[in-house]
Amino acid sequence: GITEAIVAMSPEGVDAMAPDNRERVAPHVRTLIAPELYRGPWRKGEKGLADKYAADADRAIDELDEAGYGTASLMVDTSFCSNGIPDVPKGYLKKVAAKVRAAGGMIIADEVQYGFGRPGTHMWGYEYHGVRPDIVTIGKPVGDGFPLGVVVTTPAILHAFMEQTGLFSTFGGNPMACAAGLAVLDVIEREDLLANCRDVSQHMKTGLTELMARHECIGDVRGHGFVTGVEIVSNRDTREPDAKTMVWVMNRMRELGVLTGREGHHGNVFKIRPPMVFSRDNADALVTAMDQAMREL
């Protein structure tokens, strides 16, 4: 999102829970502790992880009530990409959503990164998490390169919104953009790209995990479907983030013909989010490029 309202809500790129960064979001916004099992306060292997992380929603709801705002909604990127693509505890988002609804808020699922089959097991990230949202935002893959964004909601919510705002868009619902979006849906179904995602993503994750045996700089490999994170550290025992090495490897991979992204509060996590047509050969090329780059460190 590029509007002032969305920017005011986004903690992307900063640790929003750190005291010196809390003012980076608007006063009517509260951020939650990311359900991050690699370097978060509660880590993989501990019991009750979903409950422990979800409890932070109670704190946020109470603070909003005390400040006189109340709770309007939970807005969440269901891939948690900006948090470094953590392995989210099973049931976490469902528990948070229940707390928000009990406080009178709605659930807004941002599916720009995870939607259109990228979980592999489901078409949408909210389905993977077992949550039914009130509003869904969609972009990027929806048009396969054609500029298109979509907001999906219920007739009741849309009617109330239009009655109170009178929002009008000159380009909203233009036929060419809609045709592009429908064509993307047809291809996903006809070519069974969710099955391709399930197969290739597991193959790629296996290859990336095998690199850990050869390269000490890889601290963790995680993710689900075609959203995979590889965390780079300077020391596996202390889990010290190493953004400098990550950037060097990323740029060397680019020289080798493979593009990746960068995520996480420390800027040390590879974001690997390939297109749905990504093949096993493509995955092998990515793993080989990362291996070669790390051998050159």
What are these regions (language model features)?
Residues 1-297:
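Conserved N-terminal phosphate-binding loop of PLP-dependent enzymes in the Aspartate aminotransferase
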